[in-house]
From Swiss-Prot:
It comes from Mus musculus (Mouse). PROSITE patterns: FAD_FR (PS51384). InterPro entries: FAD-bd_FR_type, FNR_nucleotide-bd, Oxidoreductase_NAD-binding, OxRdtase_FAD/NAD-bd, Riboflavin_synthase-like_b-brl. Residues 1-16 form the signal peptide. The lineage of its organism: Eukaryota, Metazoa, Chordata, Craniata, Vertebrata. This is Oxidoreductase NAD-binding domain-containing protein 1. Its EC number is 1.-.-.-.
Length: 311
């Protein structure tokens, strides 16, 4: 896990129907405590999320959430939109949640892919979960339905949270597979910051943002329409380069200008190195290790390299 900054309030340790009103539901506090404590006690696998992230900062707030929309993002990935009524629940772009499921002893860990502003405005967060034999992923793909209730707790030291007085920074986002999730949150947050700055002139002034995103094929490039919508909305600020490693089908005319056959290369990343640029990397451990070490070998300061590995 990358260390970026300490956050006040943290402690260690198919499309559905329209969302209902936040105030109309909620797990009882006693039920919430029982659910989370039972999951923590039973979740003991050495490879599980809680053990891997035991030393990572977490917020103290444990919040109930209700599933209000389910979407197939790709053949192997489902996204969930969850309504979180608790106004004390918040997160930084790039963070993840401990995902507590009633009746499932193993705790999931899923990165948030929506922006903090979406939560503030609509009380909605979005997660994208790839199918695996891990119990939380099995539940998401096979048992989760509209109105399913879970509990969430925010954690993570990988985030982008500039303050209005901070100097503008360029961002290079390097994603592999479902590693796009926290980087999409950062991308969406950057777009929100740019809108606020253009409208009000008093929020953080974002620099340029370039996304490099690699997947097996274009059907596994998650949220590509949302990404291209941001590229088209802010052509002078946001750009993207999709990479596919095992493409067999024909690429659509709309997507083709943005797609490169083959992996993301060192040269592509090296060409964007500057004193004003921050690098965020998230993907399979070998990819994350490769690019973080490459950037260090190019004398990029360690404090400008933020990375997170997901298993």
């Amino acid at each position: 896990m990358a260390h970026v900054a300490l956050i006040p309030g943290l402690s260690r340790g198919s499309v559905g129907a329209v969302c209902t009103q936040a105030a109309s539901w909620g797990l009882k506090a006693s039920t919430l405590r029982h659910l989370t404590l039972a999951s923590i006690i039973k979740s003991r696998r050495k490879t599980d999320h809680l053990e891997r992230t035991a030393s990572v900062l977490r917020r103290e707030v444990m919040a109930a959430a209700k599933v209000c929309e389910i979407t197939h993002e790709s053949p192997s990935v489902k996204s969930l939109r969850l309504l979180v009524a608790d106004k004390d629940f918040s997160f930084k772009a790039g963070q993840w949640v401990d995902f507590f499921i009633p009746g499932v002893s193993v705790v999931g860990g899923f990165s948030i892919c929506s922006s903090p502003q979406r939560l503030e405005r609509d009380r909605i967060i979005e997660l994208a979960v790839k199918y695996a034999d891990h119990p939380p992923a099995v539940w998401v793909h096979n048992k989760c339905t509209l109105d399913s209730e879970v509990a969430l707790r925010v954690g993570g030291e990988f985030f982008f949270d500039p303050q209005p007085t901070d100097a503008p920074r360029n961002l290079i986002l390097i994603a592999g597979g479902v590693g796009i999730n926290p980087l999409l949150s950062i991308l969406r947050h950057s777009a929100d910051l740019h809108r606020d700055h253009a409208d009000k002139g008093r929020s953080y002034e974002i620099g340029t943002v370039k996304l490099f995103y690699s997947a097996k094929n274009t059907s596994e490039l998650l949220f590509k329409k949302d990404i291209l919508d941001l590229v088209h909305e802010f052509p002078e600020k946001i750009s993207c380069s999709f990479h596919v490693t095992k493409q067999t089908a024909q690429i659509s005319a709309e997507l083709k200008p943005y797609v490169t056959d083959g992996r993301i290369t060192e040269k592509e990343i090296r060409d964007h190195i500057s004193a004003e640029t921050l690098f965020y990397v998230c993907g399979p451990p070998p990819m994350t290790d490769f690019f973080s070490k490459h950037l260090e070998s190019c004398h990029v300061p360690k404090e400008h390299i933020c990375f997170e590995k997901w298993w």
